[in-house]
Swiss-Prot record:
Name of encoding gene: Tspan2
CDD domains the UniProt entry points to: CD81_like_LEL (cd03151)
Lineage: Eukaryota, Metazoa, Chordata, Craniata, Vertebrata
InterPro entries from the UniProt entry: Tetraspanin/Peripherin, Tetraspanin_animals, Tetraspanin_CS, Tetraspanin_EC2_sf
Protein name as catalogued: Tetraspanin-2
Sugar-modified residues: N139
Residue ranges annotated as Cytoplasmic topological domain: 1-13, 76-90, 210-221
Family matches, as Gene3D superfamilies: Tetraspanin (1.10.1450.10)
Function of the protein: May play a role in signalling in oligodendrocytes in the early stages of their terminal differentiation into myelin-forming glia and may also function in stabilizing the mature sheath.
GO cellular component: myelin sheath; nucleoplasm; plasma membrane
Amino acid sequence: MGRFRGGLRCIKYLLLGFNLLFWLAGSAVIAFGLWFRFGGTMKDLSSEDKSPEYFYVGLYVLVGAGALMMTVGFFGCCGAMRESQCVLGSFFTCLLVIFAAEVTTGVFAFIGKDVAIRHVQSMYEEAYSDYLKDRARGNGTLITFHSAFQCCGKESSEQVQPTCPKELPGHKNCIDKIETVISAKLQLIGIVGIGIAGLTIFGMIFSMVLCCAIRNSRDVI
């Protein structure tokens, strides 16, 4: 009996440790998602009328999952401390929802990468054409693109040189740079989503083991 209670206590502390880690991971995911959405390249693009909302869907899911992770981490600690089967069962269900959300984010980021790249490239092509037709009307949008992606023009930068960043060393094709930047960012989002999903699996295992151990201990008593 003493050995059984010792094992139960060990599982409980493992779950408590997991929930602390899970809460911190949730905070990091929210910070990561908000920084990705409102910082740097994406901050510049979001100010445009035709901002790439398709690109942001995965980030919205990621931030929502991060908020849920923080909440679930807190209730998971409560369930482990109180040894409540009901709370642990709810905790397991929430982890399952988070797992599905993170896998969706990861898959969406990897599969939707080409669509997002083409969408942003078409936005640039349109801004480029507008500038050549009316330099006053298309000036602001093109400057935003060149500043966000640190590039200038397409095959040549001569026609759009006034909109290029002054600190940019040499010519950099914006079509190629957009593909490189968006691909890298979406790949990072996908890796974070899949990584959190993997962490969630351990939480589901710990919660089920503890729930079964609590039930068995009460049966013994």
